[in-house]
Amino acid sequence: MSGAAVFVDAVVAPLGDAVGAIGFGAAAALGYRNYRDTDAEAAFWMAFTFASLLGVTWTVSLMLEKAGVATQIFNLATGPLMATTVAVFAIGGTATLAIVEDMEALVEERAQRRQEAEEERAEAERAREKAEQKQAEAERQTAEAESAKQDARERSAEIEQLAADLESQATEVGATLEAASDGDLTARVDATTDNAEIAEVATVVNDMLTTMERTIDEIQGFSTNVTTASREATAGAKEIQDASQTVSESVQEIAAGTDDQREQLESVAEEMDSYSATVEEVAATAQSVADTAADTTDVATAGKQTAEDAIDAIDAVQETMQTTVANVDALEDLTTEIDDIAELISDIAEQTNMLALNANIEAARAGSGGGSNGDGFAVVADEVKELATESQRSAKDIAELIEEVQSQTATTVEEIRVAEQRVNDGAAAVEETVDAFGAVTENIQETTDGVQEISQAMDEQAQRSERVVSSVDDIATISQATADRAENVSAASEEQTASITEVTSSLQSLAAQADTLEDRLNEFRTEATGTAHGEATDAPAGQSD
């Protein structure tokens, strides 16, 4: 045997067998791994692994045979092992086409999955861009919310200031009207304020009180004048009545001294003289009473006109109070508009809450995508939610303040209406006085008409009596003159006393009515009167001009 053959048998063949054994072993390991890990059919990899193991067995048998170990046994085994290995590889080869198809399907599936992954990546990119847009929108809305927050704070400060002014003004108006309802017309509302509506309300209330004060002063002055004049007239009438009584007594004494003379002329002159004198004196007295009644009518007419002027002034006060009620109602409408603004702020807060909820949802989406925008969205959402909570709290506080202002405004309106009712009562009392003056005027006019008729009748009778008396004048001039004067003075004194009694009664009734009017007017306190019912004139600070 040549050296080359020996080298081949000694080195190359064993080395090739070793390489083959190692290769079959590696193929078996690879086939088993693919059988376990790959998605291809398991039967192919099972056959591949089995064939590789047979190849390892065949190679080892061949190596042992060449090494002289159990030569006869391995000589018999190597041939079948080789045939089996080739057969198994052949069988595995027939399944290669199916495996290739499966691999192609697997490749297509992976390509489809890769395409889906690309689409998902593109979708994720679009979602990222959309998230960035939403983030920009959120930042813009955050800026707008911050601006709205600042505006809300400024508006809240303005509303708080307005509410404070309204509360202070309502309190002052209430105190002033309460003082006026108690009779103190010197109280005034401070009209120095920056709010035009509040200043207008204060001005209207002050004008109303000034008008009422001026009217009450005028009525009080008129009442005082009427009372004084009535008392003076009553006193004068009393003096005249006493003087008339004295004159009547003197005349009776004179008449007693002329009885003898009247007895001599009793058949002719006595009755005629007495009749004529009585008629003349009655006519004169009737004219005097008519003049007095005319003067009294003028006084009563003037009193009635003054009382009617007082009613007109009270009507003006009532119109002013109605205007004040309308202004307070307008103030209540203004608080209603402020309440609408508070509701608008509450609605903005609710919308801001919805914005915070959307921001939280976007933050959750951004966080699930693994991006860093989730935390930013969460922070923005928390800030927006805090802003919404603060806005709702401010809106609630404003609503409570408005409710309190509306309650105080309603109380003020009620107090003004009570004062208006009291003014109505005063107007009714003055109207009763006017009616009383009217009745007095009518009675005096009727008395004047009756006295005028009596005076005319007496004038006619006096003319007839003078013609009769002239026929007996020459008989007893001195006696007739004395008797006539005595009888005339006596009759005149009696008639004058009766007339003065009636006038005194009328003056006393007028004085009583004037006292009643003055008592009612004294319930009010003005700058001119100073006090009402003798009370102190101390008024709350800032409530009087």
UniProtKB/Swiss-Prot annotation:
The UniProt record lists the keyword Heme: no
Domain HAMP, chain residue ranges per copy: 164-217
Chain ranges passing through the membrane: 10-30, 44-64, 80-100
Chief place of localization: membrane
Any GO BP: chemotaxis
Alphabetized UniProt keyword annotations: Cell membrane, Chemotaxis, Membrane, Methylation, Transducer, Transmembrane, Transmembrane helix
Domain Methyl-accepting transducer: 236-476
Ranges of biased composition (kind: Basic and acidic residues): 123-157
Keyword Transferase: no
GO MF annotation terms: transmembrane signaling receptor activity
Subcellular location as annotated: Cell membrane
Residues where Glutamate methyl ester (Glu) is found: E281
Region listing for Disordered, in residue ranges: 111-157, 521-545
Low complexity composition-biased segments: 527-539
Short name of any one Pfam family annotated for the protein: MCPsignal
GO cellular component, one term: plasma membrane
Entries under PROSITE patterns matching the protein: CHEMOTAXIS_TRANSDUC_2, HAMP
Membrane topology summary: Multi-pass membrane protein
Record's comment on post-translational modification: Methylated by CheR.
Protein's job: Potentially involved in chemo- or phototactic signal transduction.
UniProt family annotation: Belongs to the methyl-accepting chemotaxis (MCP) protein family.
Protein name: Transducer protein Htr7
Organism encoding this protein: Halobacterium salinarum (strain ATCC 700922 / JCM 11081 / NRC-1)
Taxonomy of the source species: Archaea, Methanobacteriati, Methanobacteriota, Stenosarchaea group, Halobacteria
Name of the encoding gene: htr7
